[in-house]
Amino acid sequence: MASEQSSPEINADNLNSSAADVHVQPPGEKEWSDGFYDKEVINGNTPDAPKRGFLGYLIIYLLCYPVSFGGFLPGWDSGITAGFINMDNFKMNFGSYKHSTGEYYLSNVRMGLLVAMFSVGCSIGGVAFARLADTLGRRLAIVIVVLVYMVGAIIQISSNHKWYQYFVGKIIYGLGAGGCSVLCPMLLSEIAPTDLRGGLVSLYQLNMTFGIFLGYCSVYGTRKYSNTAQWRIPVGLCFLWALIIIVGMLLVPESPRYLIECERHEEACVSIAKIDKVSPEDPWVLKQADEINAGVLAQRELGEASWKELFSVKTKVLQRLITGILVQTFLQLTGENYFFFYGTTIFKSVGLTDGFETSIVLGTVNFFSTIIAVMVVDKIGRRKCLLFGAASMMACMVIFASIGVKCLYPHGQDGPSSKGAGNAMIVFTCFYIFCFATTWAPVAYIVVAESFPSKVKSKAMSISTAFNWLWQFLIGFFTPFITGSIHFYYGYVFVGCLVAMFLYVFFFLPETIGLSLEETQLLYEEGIKPWKSASWVPPSRRGASSRETEAKKKSWKEVLKFPKSFN
């Protein structure tokens, strides 16, 4: 691979250029307008995708990893917040004093706000910063929102006995993380090869689970401090995570779709080539660029996208927007944040003296389960993952809630809890998290990232993701009140939501495994019934076997197989 650009400075010029590897003599303007390649260039044959060995796969994942690390930011907040609400010094700084007990405590309102203010910021940030992706490029936009995230962290660290200052910092902190929640999956979906797109977008969720796990570990390590280091150290570590993303953006290729929209065709070819480690003049690269260019030109003929365009029935953007909103809404209504936000509190209620340790166990299950999802999501399909996830989580939640209601307190709420029932609840919580982490957690982001045409993508993704954060706020804020009133009956509410999720996916969500982003648009436009969509073949490939069959031929085990010689 040729050397990278020598300048380490982060600015709009070097972040908006992905021509860091090779100088390319671009085709003439007529060739660009008519297509990037023709039969004479490729001898009348459709170019094949580059063959990858283990090293080829490794390079792709390493190049995409800094983008996916944006998922670490909201995960880290979930992990540390779950510990903060049970820390003595944190309650002393931001809670109220109870004279009858001589202890500090967090009221339900303040606890709910502490957990939920981050989600408010994320919801606003996702919509507010999405436009930067179209004006400044995906990479520079990510750097900007990460800087906003750092400002929020500074405000939180400097808070001292002023809970309102801490909450303002939490909102600004969320603005940056919310921007990442839209921009990072967007960039991942646009630079990922079609056959690896699901796994690469899943890396965002993998890093979110990694953030939750390390967040749990950090508060476990600082819980015995008696001063403000108890909570300031975990917040201060945010600067390290932000720095990783900012430096990583110097290495990641820019979105070829964004570059082609800006008429920077040769840079788009270099961006595509960088991912698969081939020449920018390779016929496969030119074919990919041609397909993207055709899609961009088709969208351009329809005129500049407006917010009104999101409600278009003719192009079925409205249908896809509703799908994106509901999938992101259902992601929260699985009940996963019931465990992640209030994990330490829940497990203290079932008789465990150290809920921090149990939270680390749950974080470990969550992280390693998501690794499985990254490896298999492009082999199984989106619909199957979501349907299996909804059914299996429903079974686990029914058992969890039933044990909590019927068996946990055999002598009433004021009596001692049953250790056996508490242990059983922890086991089924682990099963639940496994089912969630391997299905809905990564696939919900994949569905949203690949559903929308590039013309309205930033707007549609920002609205869809905003609903994720809105529901996370509602669940985070109201859970203390609801559990205080109905206790473990709360689980049955999520069971009802899981039933609705299963039915919606079966009847309304099409399968997009093995399709390029441009082919996904054709799938929606042709109006294929979702339960028949797995066998749909795009016009350019009709006469061949179904894409689902072809995808399955490439077993994920190939990724782990060491060839005799690396690419």
Curated annotation (Swiss-Prot):
<feature type="topological domain" description="Extracellular">
    <location>
        <begin position="77"/>
        <end position="112"/>
    </location>
</feature>
<keyword id="KW-1133">Transmembrane helix</keyword>
<feature type="compositionally biased region" description="Polar residues">
    <location>
        <begin position="1"/>
        <end position="19"/>
    </location>
</feature>
<feature type="topological domain" description="Cytoplasmic">
    <location>
        <begin position="378"/>
        <end position="384"/>
    </location>
</feature>
<comment type="similarity">
    <text>Belongs to the major facilitator superfamily. Sugar transporter (TC 2.A.1.1) family.</text>
</comment>
<keyword id="KW-0813">Transport</keyword>
<feature type="region of interest" description="Disordered">
    <location>
        <begin position="1"/>
        <end position="32"/>
    </location>
</feature>
<feature type="transmembrane region" description="Helical; Name=10">
    <location>
        <begin position="428"/>
        <end position="448"/>
    </location>
</feature>
<dbReference type="InterPro" id="IPR050360">
    <property type="entry name" value="MFS_Sugar_Transporters"/>
</dbReference>
<feature type="topological domain" description="Cytoplasmic">
    <location>
        <begin position="192"/>
        <end position="197"/>
    </location>
</feature>
<keyword id="KW-0472">Membrane</keyword>
<feature type="transmembrane region" description="Helical; Name=8">
    <location>
        <begin position="360"/>
        <end position="377"/>
    </location>
</feature>
<dbReference type="GO" id="GO:0008645">
    <property type="term" value="P:hexose transmembrane transport"/>
</dbReference>
<feature type="topological domain" description="Cytoplasmic">
    <location>
        <begin position="254"/>
        <end position="336"/>
    </location>
</feature>
<feature type="topological domain" description="Extracellular">
    <location>
        <begin position="219"/>
        <end position="232"/>
    </location>
</feature>
<feature type="transmembrane region" description="Helical; Name=11">
    <location>
        <begin position="466"/>
        <end position="486"/>
    </location>
</feature>
<feature type="compositionally biased region" description="Basic and acidic residues">
    <location>
        <begin position="545"/>
        <end position="555"/>
    </location>
</feature>
<feature type="topological domain" description="Cytoplasmic">
    <location>
        <begin position="134"/>
        <end position="139"/>
    </location>
</feature>
<dbReference type="GO" id="GO:0015795">
    <property type="term" value="P:sorbitol transmembrane transport"/>
</dbReference>
<feature type="topological domain" description="Extracellular">
    <location>
        <begin position="161"/>
        <end position="170"/>
    </location>
</feature>
<dbReference type="InterPro" id="IPR005828">
    <property type="entry name" value="MFS_sugar_transport-like"/>
</dbReference>
<feature type="transmembrane region" description="Helical; Name=3">
    <location>
        <begin position="140"/>
        <end position="160"/>
    </location>
</feature>
<dbReference type="InterPro" id="IPR036259">
    <property type="entry name" value="MFS_trans_sf"/>
</dbReference>
<feature type="topological domain" description="Cytoplasmic">
    <location>
        <begin position="449"/>
        <end position="465"/>
    </location>
</feature>
<feature type="topological domain" description="Extracellular">
    <location>
        <position position="487"/>
    </location>
</feature>
<keyword id="KW-0762">Sugar transport</keyword>
<feature type="topological domain" description="Cytoplasmic">
    <location>
        <begin position="509"/>
        <end position="567"/>
    </location>
</feature>
<feature type="transmembrane region" description="Helical; Name=5">
    <location>
        <begin position="198"/>
        <end position="218"/>
    </location>
</feature>
<comment type="function">
    <text>Probable glucose transporter.</text>
</comment>
<protein>
    <recommendedName>
        <fullName>Hexose transporter HXT16</fullName>
    </recommendedName>
</protein>
<feature type="transmembrane region" description="Helical; Name=7">
    <location>
        <begin position="337"/>
        <end position="353"/>
    </location>
</feature>
<feature type="topological domain" description="Cytoplasmic">
    <location>
        <begin position="1"/>
        <end position="55"/>
    </location>
</feature>
<dbReference type="GO" id="GO:0055056">
    <property type="term" value="F:D-glucose transmembrane transporter activity"/>
</dbReference>
<feature type="transmembrane region" description="Helical; Name=9">
    <location>
        <begin position="385"/>
        <end position="405"/>
    </location>
</feature>
<feature type="transmembrane region" description="Helical; Name=4">
    <location>
        <begin position="171"/>
        <end position="191"/>
    </location>
</feature>
<feature type="transmembrane region" description="Helical; Name=6">
    <location>
        <begin position="233"/>
        <end position="253"/>
    </location>
</feature>
<dbReference type="Pfam" id="PF00083">
    <property type="entry name" value="Sugar_tr"/>
</dbReference>
<keyword id="KW-0677">Repeat</keyword>
<feature type="topological domain" description="Extracellular">
    <location>
        <begin position="406"/>
        <end position="427"/>
    </location>
</feature>
<feature type="region of interest" description="Disordered">
    <location>
        <begin position="533"/>
        <end position="555"/>
    </location>
</feature>
<keyword id="KW-0812">Transmembrane</keyword>
<dbReference type="InterPro" id="IPR003663">
    <property type="entry name" value="Sugar/inositol_transpt"/>
</dbReference>
